[in-house]
């Protein structure tokens, strides 16, 4: 049987099983247009800025002096952070979004892990891990994303 071209984009191989449309019943990411104005990021709002999204989550064994996604930040501000590209996430009295509870245990549904392609943590579908972006490359990428 000839496999017709798929309308799904990205890393996708057409499904030839009994239920060929099951693989496209999935989350569809939004366009990057206006991404600078849609903080906080990830499905649960656990990353306050695009700059933080380009960083990895701190894991056990990671060096203390590295740059990581914040484990907590203030929410409720409408003040734009033009450097990190998101909403101001500190320096005012707001609600504190926490990844972990007082015991240091991760709060279910509040994880800020995943989608760490630019930090050299998440592998591509072929298993290849891309090299991490340095700070200058992250800032250059943010400048581009501001134009969308």
Predicted regions span which residues?
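Periplasmic c-type cytochrome electron-transfer domains
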Residues: 1-148
């Amino acid at each position: 049987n000839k496999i017709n071209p798929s309308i799904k984009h990205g890393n996708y191989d057409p499904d030839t099983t009994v239920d060929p449309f099951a693989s496209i019943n999935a989350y569809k990411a939004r366009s990057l247009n206006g991404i600078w104005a849609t903080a906080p990021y990830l499905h649960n709002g656990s990353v306050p800025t695009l700059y933080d999204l380009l960083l990895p989550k701190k894991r056990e064994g990671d060096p203390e002096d590295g740059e990581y996604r914040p484990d907590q930040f203030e929410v409720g501000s409408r003040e734009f952070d033009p450097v990190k590209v998101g909403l101001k996430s500190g320096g005012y009295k707001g609600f504190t979004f926490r990844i972990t509870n007082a015991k240091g245990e991760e709060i279910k549904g509040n994880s800020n892990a995943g989608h760490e392609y630019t930090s050299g943590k998440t592998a591509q579908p072929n298993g290849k891990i891309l090299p991490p972006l340095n700070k200058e490359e992250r800032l250059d990428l943010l400048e581009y994303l501001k134009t969308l």
